[in-house]
Amino acid sequence: MKEKLQQIKNTALEELNKISNKAELENIRVKYLGKKGELTQILRGMGKLSSQERPVIGKLANEVRGSIEELIEKAVTEIKLKEKEAKLKNEVIDISMPGRKQTVGRKNPLQLTLDSIMDIFISMGFSIEEGPEVEKDYYNFEALNIPKNHPARGEQDTFYINDDVVLRTQTSPIQVRTMENQKPPIKMIAPGKVYRSDSVDATHSPIFYQIEGLVIDKGITFADLKGTLELFTKKMFGEKMQTKFRPHHFPFTEPSAEMDATCFVCGGKGCNVCKNSGWIELLGCGMVHPDVLRNCGIDPEVYSGFAFGFGLDRMVMQKYELDDIRLLYESDMRFLNQF
């Protein structure tokens, strides 16, 4: 039995030294170590040996098995190395050949418009502030005068992470955090992505961009709000643009309004975009509610302020006469090359 085991070891070693590919290696493995392999059969027959022979032969058989497995592992490494060398040899790269022309991307109209808006507000003395998109319920609702069970919460289908954490439905939480962390005067805008539980169609998306602004100082009035927004509108769309304000209601501002602007497609003459009214709804705004100021540690008897906000996607769709919001998020170069 000892001689047979030694012969198996020597034969296996000899055969392993001659192999040149994985298939031959697998055949040798099966021949000696497979279910019906020569060494496997010997190990299965150990029970027929005497009690004196069994430990001696068992030890030798395991040593032979270990030697063969070690040789097979070494052979696998050598074969992989040879295959890699052969592949590298065959994959010769002619560095003198001209390279492939890379397609140059284009800025999305959302980003183009956002850049223009930020440049305008920076020129007006505003700072750009950012905040988390995964937000606490307190900052998204309660600090903005929207307590639990408030009717205004029903207007926004919210993605809840848990009872206290949401995907922000507006960039207003950035205003709250700014008021908490900075002392007045404050003059900032907060652009960013917001989330609503909407089904995707031509005019709705669960993710869209919003820009909100905030000014806090002593003696701020509604006249400051109107002047700021009228100046922004003229800088953004041209000196001929007109604006008008309509009373509205928001829980975080009082008084509140919506601002309409001359349709920038037809210039106020009437078209499909403005539904032949000559006006388009541009943004919501109002004087910051005293309770919101108190929630942020600002005394409403000393300071006042205004806030405003608008959806960037809607503005871009109106400006470029787009009929499908999905075009803004598909990264189709045929579409982007038009801007």
Curated annotation (Swiss-Prot):
Record's signal peptide: none
Keywords: Aminoacyl-tRNA synthetase, ATP-binding, Cytoplasm, Ligase, Magnesium, Metal-binding, Nucleotide-binding, Protein biosynthesis
Domain of life, source organism: Bacteria
Positions bound to Mg(2+): E254
E.C. no: 6.1.1.20
InterPro entries referenced in this protein's UniProt entry, alphabetically: aa-tRNA-synth_II, aa-tRNA-synth_II/BPL/LPL, Phe-tRNA-synth_IIc_asu, Phe-tRNA_ligase_II_N, Phe_tRNA_ligase_alpha1_bac, Phenylalanyl-tRNA_Synthase, tRNA-bd_arm
Protein name: Phenylalanine--tRNA ligase alpha subunit
CDD domains referenced in this protein's UniProt entry, alphabetically: PheRS_alpha_core
